[in-house]
Amino acid sequence: MSYTPSEFRQQIRSRRLSGPTAGYCGDYAQANLAILPKQHADDFLRFCTLNPKACPLLGIGEPGDWRVPALGADLDIRNDVPAFYVYRHGERAEEVRSLDELWRDDLVVFAIGCSFSFEEMLRREGIALRHIEQQVNVPMYRTRERNVAAGVFGGNRVVSMRPMKAADAIRAIQITSRFPAVHGAPVHIGDPSLIGIRDLASPDFGDAVEVRSDELPVFWACGVTPQAAIESARLPFAIAHKPGHMLVTDIPNTTLAVL
């Protein structure tokens, strides 16, 4: 069944839908979330600015406001995402479906572009996406590549992976390069060990997918990178989306193209 972004958010809010959001509302941008106390917001904004491949900002909320009008007219961040991770002192403490009981007046929402946003363009060009075929979450991996630090925020880059034949990988570079607001072109193609990934069958987030003998692993910078930064910062309290469980926005993907 197809939904408008508003309808999809209502389905999530009412608990009629849950799980990863890849493949839904393909014409509209999806967003990663980082929700932090106001005292850390300036440093985190600088972190995003210094790491634009992994942390391209789509919108920022006002302190204490769960609405981000730039992302959607009827949006309620507290309930419009399928699942959230709650971090305490840099450790993931719990997973929740709603932020109603955790919301505070000092929390600032950062919405960060997601590679799910360009997947519909890839599919329209006939490029198969294995995680959608297998109906699982996209695999995501921690790398050894360091982020540019800002204040307390640092950590290592996280990447998502999609296996493709060489010709499809070339076309994927051409297509995704037009969308820097949702991570843009891949950051690595081929040997995962070169970026510190030991085993593609054991992702740090999401689910493993089949990589066939005639395919290359293609890696994009991932909006889970802020969660690595939150871990390294060891903030007393922070919130993020559960990887793969995104906020669907009202932003048409076509408006994010730069070419």
Swiss-Prot record:
It comes from the Bacteria. GO terms for molecular function: lyase activity. It holds the Pfam family D-Glu_cyclase. Keywords: Lyase. Its EC number is 4.2.1.-. The keyword Nucleotidyltransferase does not apply. Disulfide bonds: none annotated. It is an enzyme of class 4 (lyase). SUPFAM superfamilies: PSTPO5379-like. Belongs to the D-glutamate cyclase family. NCBIfam families: PRK05463.1. This is Putative hydro-lyase Bphyt_4813. It comes from Paraburkholderia phytofirmans (strain DSM 17436 / LMG 22146 / PsJN) (Burkholderia phytofirmans).
